[in-house]
């Protein structure tokens, strides 16, 4: 009895796995929310320190927070966004300000 077997070349199953497309990571906006107690200068400091914004851009974002109630500080992967939110929250509490910082999926 003769049987015909088709032998796969070594590593051919790996090639198929490499062809599958990898989805880009989910991105998140880090958002600052307005309150009646946090000084504008402190918000600018946060934006410069944790989001590396220059003074002009930080002032623009701070004014958007002030007049519109919230503003996006930056867009990051989940882990980086979580870290930014934690850093801003901790720094705000250390300085006795109730500034709210959240993340929202894009």
From Swiss-Prot:
BP-aspect Gene Ontology terms: protein catabolic process; proteolysis
Superkingdom of source: Bacteria
Classification via Gene3D superfamilies: 3.30.1390.10
InterPro entries per record: ClpS, ClpS_core, Ribosomal_bL12_C/ClpS-like
Function: Involved in the modulation of the specificity of the ClpAP-mediated ATP-dependent protein degradation.
Entry similarity comment: Belongs to the ClpS family.
Subunit text: Binds to the N-terminal domain of the chaperone ClpA.
Protein name in the entry: ATP-dependent Clp protease adapter protein ClpS
């Amino acid at each position: 009895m003769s049987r015909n077997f088709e032998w796969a070349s070594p590593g051919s199953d790996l090639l198929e796995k490499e062809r599958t497309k990898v989805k880009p990571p989910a991105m998140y906006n880090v958002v600052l929310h307005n309150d009646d107690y946090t000084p504008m200068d402190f918000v600018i400091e946060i934006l410069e320190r944790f989001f590396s914004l220059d003074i002009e851009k930080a002032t623009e974002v701070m004014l958007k927070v002030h007049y519109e109630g919230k503003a996006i500080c930056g867009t990051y992967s989940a882990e980086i966004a979580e870290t930014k939110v934690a850093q801003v929250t901790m720094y705000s509490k250390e300085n006795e300000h109730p500034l709210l910082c959240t993340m929202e999926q894009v």
